[in-house]
């Protein structure tokens, strides 16, 4: 009977350690998914900023049509630079979901 109790105690300890490991893995996945969601804020803020910038560019061209080429050149360069922030955020969220969350 003592051997049965020892075996049951050993199995209980193993199951408890397995459960703790599963909890840690679940917490790591949860943290990765929350981090991925937070990084996507970068994409939304870039969209808001680009909308504001393009609106102001249209206003500038409406006031002074002669500067259309200059404004569009600056707008496209600025748009590409600001879009890189959203792309980096998307890349980080993919890494968090598919690498850290796996």
UniProtKB/Swiss-Prot annotation:
MF (Gene Ontology): lipid binding; proton-transporting ATP synthase activity, rotational mechanism
Q: How does it sit in the membrane?
A: Multi-pass membrane protein
User: Would you say which domain of life the source belongs to?
Assistant: Bacteria
**GO terms, biological process:** proton motive force-driven ATP synthesis
What transmembrane ranges does the database entry give? 34-54, 80-100
Q: Which GO terms describe its cellular component?
A: plasma membrane; proton-transporting ATP synthase complex; proton-transporting two-sector ATPase complex, proton-transporting domain
Write down the position(s) of the site called Reversibly protonated during proton transport. Answer: 83
One Pfam family cited in the UniProt record for this chain: ATP-synt_C
As for subcellular location, the record says:
Cell membrane
The alphabetical list of record keywords is:
ATP synthesis, Cell membrane, CF(0), Hydrogen ion transport, Ion transport, Lipid-binding, Membrane, Transmembrane, Transmembrane helix, Transport
Family indicated by similarity: Belongs to the ATPase C chain family.
What does the miscellaneous comment read?
A: Dicyclohexylcarbodiimide (DCDD) binding to the active glutamate residue inhibits ATPase in vitro.
Quaternary structure per UniProt?
F-type ATPases have 2 components, F(1) - the catalytic core - and F(0) - the membrane proton channel. F(1) has five subunits: alpha(3), beta(3), gamma(1), delta(1), epsilon(1). F(0) has three main subunits: a(1), b(2) and c(10-14). The alpha and beta chains form an alternating ring which encloses part of the gamma chain. F(1) is attached to F(0) by a central stalk formed by the gamma and epsilon chains, while a peripheral stalk is formed by the delta and b chains.
Summarizing the function annotation, the protein's role is:
F(1)F(0) ATP synthase produces ATP from ADP in the presence of a proton or sodium gradient. F-type ATPases consist of two structural domains, F(1) containing the extramembraneous catalytic core and F(0) containing the membrane proton channel, linked together by a central stalk and a peripheral stalk. During catalysis, ATP synthesis in the catalytic domain of F(1) is coupled via a rotary mechanism of the central stalk subunits to proton translocation. Key component of the F(0) channel; it plays a direct role in translocation across the membrane. A homomeric c-ring of between 10-14 subunits forms the central stalk rotor element with the F(1) delta and epsilon subunits.
Q: What is the official name of this protein in its record?
A: ATP synthase subunit c
Query: Could you tell me which species this protein originates from?
Result: Mycoplasma genitalium (strain ATCC 33530 / DSM 19775 / NCTC 10195 / G37)
